[in-house]
Design a protein with these regions (language model features):
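Short amphipathic alpha-helical interface segments
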Residues: 2-51
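A short, conserved structural fragment
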Residues: 58-68
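A general structural signal for well-ordered secondary-structure junctions
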Residues: 27-28, 63, 90
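Generic structural signal for hydrophobic core residues of well-folded globular domains
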Residues: 21-25, 61-62, 84
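Short, amphipathic alpha-helical interaction segments positioned at domain boundaries
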Residues: 75-96
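Minor-groove-contacting beta-hairpin "wing" of winged helix-turn-helix DNA-binding domains
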Residues: 69-74
């Protein structure tokens, strides 16, 4: 469950990085009353310069790490993004 006291620790850059990890494109948001987005991915390769930002997201539970420099937005991270953007994030599209 997302603890609202950690919200103030998240920077705008981290929010943008989390949206980028999910492939977020506001032009592909569906619905008017119940806005939703179906991500086609959930991964972010940090290289070397974004590692600290993502490690902070991992420490507060908004991301997970799969291997060196590869991160994924966690379920709590998606809940946080839903509250920030007003858009529900559906499960990642699997290859069809």
């Amino acid at each position: 469950m997302v603890n609202s006291t950690v919200y103030e620790k998240v920077t705008y850059k981290q929010i943008d990085d989390m949206k980028h990890a999910l492939g977020f494109d506001k032009r592909k948001v569906r619905g008017i009353k119940h806005r939703r987005y179906e991500p086609y991915r959930n991964y972010f390769n940090t290289g070397e310069r974004d590692v600290d930002d993502w490690e902070q997201l991992v420490s507060i539970g908004f991301a997970t790490k799969s291997r060196e420099n590869w991160y994924h937005v966690s379920d709590d991270g998606k809940i946080f993004l839903e509250r920030v953007t007003g858009v529900s994030f559906l499960p990642v599209i699997q290859n069809k």
